[in-house]
């Protein structure tokens, strides 16, 4: 979508149209909002993480082309997410504010009320859970805490209700614990993550990754908090967090999905950028917001 701002717009838009068609044909049931994990609408491996990304995609298509069906699809996907116990889930990149803003602009008041109520219920549930985080795909990690902070903080932005700001601040206090301020670009405001070189890398090595693209999620939350409260310290910290993942891109145009920071892991040499370029463009997306 960002490529549409460049000079070769026609070629980029054709590619985007083709991907939009692929998404609807292979992954998303636009009528029901179901988002499948694999092509062929194969949902044998159920994954709620896919839903927020699908909402974001169709929202961006709506913003670009002005085709109302994309906005409606984003709403149906949101509703389907919550039908499947999404209220207790910790989603990465749920575009709460953007969806509400776009529905408001489009005059879709009924849909706006529906999704606002869903988002409030979600935030209320996460506040009730507090710091007694349930296990997700792993038992505990930064990308469980950050979604809690981000969902609650976005609901505060949409509603202006003080209880959501207080709830988000409880989560941010925990989120900060994943970051250090060491004088090394690998470690300065870069949230610690552990499994990503194994799950997403070529060499499949467990070990602390500094950085991995999801590290920058902290930066998004810190900057949102700064904007809503006027706390400049968090704006600076957020900027450092976002810049930290830019080290995953190299001057020759190649990139890495994760940097395995320890010198060795279980006796195996580490301290390397994994050869795979795999999803690291999320880091660019977060810097472009």
Label each residue range with its predicted role:
Residues 47-50, 144, 211:
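Hydrophobic alpha-helical segments of membrane proteins, primarily the transmembrane helices
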Residues 40-49, 54, 60-62, 68-75, ...:
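C-terminal low-complexity, acidic/polar tails when present
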Residues 8-26, 65-84, 107-130, 160-178, ...:
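Extended, well-ordered alpha-helical scaffold segments
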Residues 1-63, 72-75, 79:
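Substrate-binding groove/exosite segments of carbohydrate-active enzymes
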Residues 23-43, 70, 76-94, 120-145, ...:
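Glycine- and aromatic-rich loop/turn segments at beta-sheet edges
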Residues 1-10, 53-67, 83, 93-112, ...:
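Well-ordered alpha-helical scaffold segments within catalytic/enzyme domains
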Residues 121, 125, 148-289:
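Terminal, non-catalytic domain-edge segments
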